[in-house]
From Swiss-Prot:
Enzyme Commission no: 2.7.4.25
Protein name, as recorded: Cytidylate kinase
Xref: Gene3D superfamilies: P-loop containing nucleotide triphosphate hydrolases (3.40.50.300)
Organism: Shewanella woodyi (strain ATCC 51908 / MS32)
Chain's gene name: cmk
Disulfides per UniProt: none
């Protein structure tokens, strides 16, 4: 396939900083944003709202085909605004329950295929920042710029703990670490679109570096590989 606009893919495990960097890049460049992980969390939330079982691939696929989701940037420290059928669900989809459910529904091949078409439709001028787990390997495999962000499981658990605490959720960091390791194992070893860096992706370990440094590395890589982008 050929993309209709320049696409920068950002893949990696949960908590590596993909969401923050994707938002900052989209705002800095004035590009569209696709949060693939949020799409799966939105689908999981829609399934919960509509009483669809998380192991019912037929019903989940039908729900995915009609999923109405939008991403709105420019909200500053509040992050990306995620809208499902006209309702702001930005906080709802960040719960640990929804996060775990998203990983489960993402394991179904036909569900992924239904959402694949929707994700590719986000590629519009002037460009797209695509944040996910298989953006560079599957969804936008011909994207000119691919990044892969990673960090230790312990660092990612701490970040998730801080994030959920700030949002008022009562969480246990040891439980979070266990869930993150289990999710990594599921995502990296599933038969369909496992979580791995694309062969031509720039891998950035964010464990010991700050947001600004990661952003500068990403921008420099984009500018090097895409002419006319600054």
């Amino acid at each position: 396939m050929s993309e209709r606009a320049p696409v920068v893919t950002i893949d990696g495990p949960s908590g590596a900083g993909k969401g923050t960097i994707s938002q900052l890049l989209a705002e800095r460049l004035g590009w569209k944003l696709l949060d693939s992980g949020a799409i799966y969390r939105v689908l999981a939330l829609a399934a919960i709202h509509h009483n669809v079982e998380l192991d019912n691939e037929d019903s989940l696929t039908l729900l995915a085909a009609h999923l109405d989701v939008q991403f709105i940037t420019g909200n500053g420290s509040k992050g990306i605004k995620v809208v499902l059928e006209g309702e702001d669900v930005s906080n709802d989809i960040r719960s640990q329950e929804c996060s775990n459910a998203a990983s489960k529904v993402a394991a179904f091949p036909r569900v992924r295929e239904a959402l694949l078409r929707r994700q590719r439709a986000f590629s519009e001028a002037p460009g797209l920042i695509a944040d996910g787990r298989d953006m560079g390997t599957v969804v936008f495999s011909k994207a000119p710029v691919k990044l892969y962000l990673t960090a230790s499981a312990e660092e990612r658990a701490q970040r998730r703990y801080n994030q959920l605490q700030d949002k008022g959720f009562d969480v246990n960091i040891d439980q979070l670490l266990t869930e993150i390791k289990e999710r990594d194992d599921r995502d990296m070893n599933r038969s369909v679109a496992p979580l791995v860096p694309a062969e031509d992706a720039l891998v950035i370990d964010t464990s010991q570096i700050g947001i600004e440094e990661v952003l500068n590395i990403a921008l420099a890589h984009i500018e090097t590989n895409l002419s006319g982008v600054s």
